[in-house]
């Protein structure tokens, strides 16, 4: 029996050591969880094999527009005959996403040319395409087209029933303004035609990029966008109107004016355009590549087909 106190003492010591060990483990775990994550530059560099695997995975990403047939409506920035760039934005999209391009953009055209381009698309390809991208508006600004209004209003009778027997009442009634002499009227005419011609085709509108000096001889000198046009309207008013198309006509709008980052108003940004001294209107290859990257990322969030 004389060993009993000794055994009890040893047991107490073991218990204390076990508790101390558990406390240390708990403390270490808490410190680990509380420790801030190391910044990326402190992490172990990837091996060449890991890099190759990630690049392969990126290339294999299934973009929703990959391999689709897309029609492009627009002006000189879309026109394949304009030599400011060897590859247009739609050409880069063709390379990167294997998109088949049907290009109808013509230099100098304005929003009132969209119905003609739509008719040509229908004549050449019928219904055998997936989507339409519209990149238009800079020439409407340059030619001083008034902005106009989206709607006209009348007071009309309409039958209404709201928790009581129906009755005829007078209410304001909106109608799309189909004025071919204003920007919004032209857009309404174009979108009305497209929505009825192709009700189940994805239509995407893009805002015009920033613009600076363009000088092509004595009879074609276009000041930069910091000057009002002949109507006393600044360029950004046209951009704002085109952005509104999304809600008026239920179409996605890619705001290239902001998202592309192209800014030719400063000399530093002129490197993305054709000629720093005379053409800061038309992007060069680098500018078109930047536009295409922006468009590709924006399209990744949109279905190409209904």
Where are these regions (language model features)?
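Sec/Tat signal peptide C-region and signal peptidase I cleavage site
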Residues: 38-42
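Bacterial N-terminal signal peptides that target proteins for export
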Residues: 17-27
């Amino acid at each position: 029996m004389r060993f009993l106190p000794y055994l009890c003492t040893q047991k107490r010591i073991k218990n204390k050591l076990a508790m101390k060990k558990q406390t240390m483990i708990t403390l270490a775990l808490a410190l680990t969880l509380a420790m801030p994550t190391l910044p990326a530059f402190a992490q172990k560099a990837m091996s060449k094999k890991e890099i190759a695997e990630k690049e392969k995975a990126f290339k294999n990403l299934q973009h929703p527009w990959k391999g689709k047939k897309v029609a492009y409506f627009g002006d000189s920035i879309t026109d394949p005959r304009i030599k400011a760039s060897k590859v247009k934005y739609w050409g880069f999209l063709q390379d990167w996403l294997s998109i088949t391009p049907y290009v109808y953009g013509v230099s100098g055209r304005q929003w009132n040319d969209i119905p003609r381009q739509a008719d040509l698309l229908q004549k050449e390809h019928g219904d055998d395409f997936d989507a339409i991208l519209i990149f238009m508006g800079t020439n409407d600004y340059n030619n001083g087209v008034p902005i106009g209004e989206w709607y006209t209003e009348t007071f009309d009778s309409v039958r209404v029933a709201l928790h009581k027997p129906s009755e005829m009442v007078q209410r304001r009634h909106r109608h799309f303004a189909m004025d071919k002499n204003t920007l919004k009227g032209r857009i309404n005419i174009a979108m009305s035609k497209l929505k009825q011609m192709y009700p189940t085709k994805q239509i995407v509108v893009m805002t015009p990029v920033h613009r600076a000096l363009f000088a092509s001889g004595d009879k074609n000198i276009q000041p930069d966008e910091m000057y009002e046009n002949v109507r006393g309207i600044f360029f950004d008013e046209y951009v704002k109107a085109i952005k509104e198309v999304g809600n008026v006509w239920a179409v996605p709008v890619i705001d290239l004016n902001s998202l592309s980052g192209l800014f030719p108003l400063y000399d530093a940004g002129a490197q993305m355009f054709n000629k720093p001294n005379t053409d800061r209107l038309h992007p060069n290859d680098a500018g078109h590549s930047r536009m295409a990257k922006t468009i590709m990322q924006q399209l990744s969030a949109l279905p190409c087909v209904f």
